[in-house]
A protein has these predicted regions:
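Basic, ligand-binding patches in group-transfer machinery
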Residues: 77-197
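Intrinsically disordered, polar/acidic, low-complexity terminal segments
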Residues: 12-114
Length: 197
């Protein structure tokens, strides 16, 4: 009997760890996609998509022009479009979240960044699926939710996977904004002004 209980506990513990590993694997792949969509060359995550990132970067423009692969997705087509395309249902303040880290990947007139944080949709009490980054009224990148955040879970029980990671570009000296889609109406909620030189 003891052996059966011990085995069951071991199997359940392994399954929980496997779930965390699966989510992490997916998040790393998604981060590679956000890097390409934003035009930020983040080798740390591009290598998660393909072992030789140079090939992805070389073929990326062709894929974009012909709306192939992730460029053909609804989300992929939003990058570079006016933020107003997301504002059909207005704005709200019914969200919580924080930008934990901004890593500058490329500098110059146009800055490329990897951005990490967490967000919660208080209208539906759910974790948003993605974060939208905007610069001067244009969608300049996206991020995907699902990253493990025990610190957020401690404050907001039920939100263990409220973390997100994404990429965006912005012009030097301008502000980069982060939004999530909130509620059943999908109104945009501004998380925070995250950069201004």
């Amino acid at each position: 009997m003891f052996l059966a209980i011990f085995s069951l506990i071991h199997v359940l513990t392994y399954q929980v760890k496997l779930d965390d590993y699966s989510r992490d694997w997916i998040n790393r792949k998604q981060a590679g996609v956000t890097s390409i969509l934003a035009g930020v060359v983040d080798l740390k995550y591009l290598t998660r998509l393909f072992p030789t990132p140079d090939r992805i970067l070389r073929d990326s423009e062709f894929l974009r022009e012909h709306r192939l692969s992730f460029y053909g997705s609804e989300i992929g087509q939003k990058v570079g479009q006016p933020l107003a395309t997301f504002l059909g249902n207005g704005t709200t303040t019914n969200c919580e979240g924080y930008i934990d880290k901004i890593s500058i990947i490329s500098d110059g007139n146009t800055i490329g960044a990897r951005i990490e944080g967490w967000a919660v949709d208080r209208a539906t009490n759910e974790i948003p699926k993605m974060v939208v980054f905007a610069n001067q009224g244009t969608v300049s990148g996206i991020g995907f939710s699902g990253r493990l955040r025990p610190d957020v879970e401690a404050l907001y029980p039920g939100y263990l996977y409220a973390g997100w990671l994404g990429h965006a570009t912005f012009l030097s000296g301008t502000e980069l904004e982060a939004y999530i889609s909130v509620g059943t109406e999908n109104a945009l909620c501004k998380l925070i002004d995250i950069h201004g030189d």
